[in-house]
Amino acid sequence: EPYLKNRQIMRFKDAIYDLNNNVSQPGIYAIPSELSMNSPLVPMENPDPVYGPYIRWDLYKELGYPQIDALEDLLPVLKQMQELEPAADNGEKTYAFSFFKDWDSNLMNAVKQPCCFYGYDEYGFVLVKADSSDYQSIIDPDSLYVRVLKWYFDANQMGLVDPESSTQTFESFETKYKEGQLLFCTWPWVAQPAYNTQERTKEGKGFMMADIGDMVIYSYGCSPVGNQKVVMSIGSKAEDPERLAAFVDWLYSPEGIRNNRAQTSGGMAGPEGLCWEYGEDGPYLTDFGKKALLGEDVEVPEEWGKGTWSEGISALNYSTVASCELDEKGYPYAYLLWDSVRNMNISPLEIDWREKMGAETTMEYLQKNNKILVSPGTGYMAPQENSEMAAIRRQCRKVIQEYSWNIVFAADEAEFNRLYEQMCKEVKELGYETMLDIDLWNAKKKEDARWEAV
């Protein structure tokens, strides 16, 4: 704590103390991430949500923008898109869907993502609606999780699922978007940076969000107390804790915020004077910034240290503040939210999407059409589970993961049903209902904390 006294990071002192009040010994042991001065009801994401139905818009346009009323209606559209472009530029077969196991936790991660199209996110073995109006056990036959399992099963029966999904890594998954082998993505922050190169978007090609008639996308609200699960700390055996504290303070300064997140596509704007400047109408990108921030690995001028842009940018995957935060002059730190950038060299892809959707950005469309549901930000931390409960959870999640993958790739509907019933039977024998009760209790406590923050 003495190392942070009178430093600028203490403008976030309420959030810092909120986190450290949970520690038995007084003092400051950690700084939360993704801090925000905004209301908990303000979406943290902009100009795109974390989740959404992102498709190859050029192929969707070629089909005449068919109406998609519900999740299930998307499959025949994706099949027609696959028929329009059966092979990628590298000669490999195209698929709508591809998965990987790296991020599986209490469930199959790829199945959880489309649940977010309907305002739900996971909490243990529970799907929680952003407005706290519904709580679902993931294995309930009427749950969204089971609905998406069936959706992916149907997609696989139609030849829309990449058969390499169960053995590949995230890196392989991402590469397939770069190569044009995939036609759908639940994450704009994967598909768009990978596929939407300037060359392709000039041709009208790229991933953009399509509308599903009944979707209401889950959005993470800004948290005044930040993300208390991902924190910044100084080790007890650090040789120079005062110097490290100065570095942490810099990371949370306006300069540090911009420079640290400049490596992320659509992130912060990088160094002032090199990547951007303030003009009469607000911030704008320099010629160097346009190239570097939009994916070109340019040479850095000698006065800035020489070398290439990719060699010098931060490799720290850590967000000190929310993407929607404003700087000291009232402009967003995230350059994609600047008026000068939003209207800069708009590609034929973006022009067509804007004309069809009647909005300049995805978030603007979702907000105008009441298709987003914000979960208020909070720093609620669940009590730590004892060893017995942790063991039951490990066993249940292992069963749910393995069966979920097998269900998606089941040979036919009879096998789908058999595997689903067997999954439910096995986890219940392991103690699933006990864990479900714990998760429901914690989920409701977290929701109470969210609305208290509002």
Show the residue positions of the predicted features:
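Carboxylate/His-rich catalytic cores and anion/metal-binding grooves
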Residues: E1-N20, L78-Q82, E92-K129, Q181-R200
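Conserved small-residue motifs centered on glycine
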Residues: R258-E402
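Short, solvent-exposed loop/beta-turn-alpha elements that line the ligand-binding surface or hinge
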Residues: E1-F12, D121-S143, I217-Y220, C275-E302, ...
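Ligand-binding "clamshell"
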Residues: E1, Y195-I217
